[in-house]
Curated annotation (Swiss-Prot):
Belongs to the HY2 family. It catalyses: (2R,3Z)-phycocyanobilin + 4 oxidized [2Fe-2S]-[ferredoxin] = biliverdin IXalpha + 4 reduced [2Fe-2S]-[ferredoxin] + 4 H(+). The gene is pcyA. Pfam families: Fe_bilin_red. It comes from the Bacteria. This is Phycocyanobilin:ferredoxin oxidoreductase.
Length: 245
């Protein structure tokens, strides 16, 4: 099994961001047989400047029998902004939804926290086994829920998008992310490959998911200011939300 650790070089982040990164990798290690996923050499660790501040992006990616790419990104912009981004892209031969989570920290406070397992079926619903387990989690027990963006129709009814207030809510969010991850990994390793016809439907669904995610204007604006539009398109389509072949 591949041994992993994150964060590393050049990344000094909000403690909650570091805690979540370590939690994600711990669950992956517990359930999945991780193998390297090779990014282009210039995209594993990236530095730039944004409004006078140093911007650092560090990417780690893995693959498994069930997932074509597990992506964990950490980013910092000077002392102002800390970001964690994670998506688990299934192989099109497995009928799995897509797990994703993000944390955004600004000046020591977490301003946004989101986690979801997004359906990939034609009826835009999660498999019943997911519904049964997710509905038991305390996702309604947060003081400051946030509104999903217009392109957020890709998310499930169990999407949790909040601004956590205080240590208790922050730790509750971490616990919920771990539960989502464990449910998803358990279901993944129990799945069997589907027919070629079903693979075509999964391929279409992943294309749609990636296309919608690339509409996140906030992400694009930050990257374009630091690296320009051409590099931003390259990064969005190669690292963040690359569609399967």
């Amino acid at each position: 099994m591949l041994k992993t650790s994150i964060p590393s070089q050049g990344i000094q982040q909000n403690p909650l961001v570091c805690q979540l990164a370590n939690s994600i990798e711990a669950v992956w290690q517990r359930y999945l047989n991780l193998e390297p996923y090779y990014l282009p050499a210039d995209l594993g660790y990236v530095e730039g400047r944004l409004e006078g501040e140093k911007l650092i992006i560090q990417n780690k990616c893995y693959q498994t029998a069930q997932f074509r790419k597990l992506h964990l990104e950490l980013a910092t912009i000077g002392p102002k902004l800390d970001i964690l981004h994670c998506v688990m892209f299934p192989r099109i031969s497995y009928p799995l939804p897509i797990f994703g989570t993000d944390l955004v920290g600004a000046r020591g406070q977490i301003s946004a926290a989101v986690v979801d397992i997004s359906p990939q079926s034609q009826d835009r619903k999660l498999p019943e086994v997911y519904n049964y387990q997710l509905q038991a989690l305390p996702i309604k027990e947060f003081a400051h829920p946030r509104q999903l963006p217009q392109w957020g129709e890709i998310f499930s009814e169990f999407c949790l998008f909040i601004r956590p207030t205080g240590l208790e809510e922050e730790q509750k969010f971490i616990s919920i992310v771990e539960s989502y991850l464990e449910i998803h990994c358990q279901q993944a390793i129990a799945q069997k490959p589907v027919s070629p016809e079903q693979q075509l439907e999964i391929l279409k669904a992943q294309h749609h998911y990636c296309t919608q995610q690339r509409q996140n204007d906030k992400t694009r604006r930050v990257l374009e200011k630091a690296f320009g539009p051409e590099w931003t398109d390259y990064y969005l389509t190669t690292v963040l939300f690359d569609s399967p072949n």
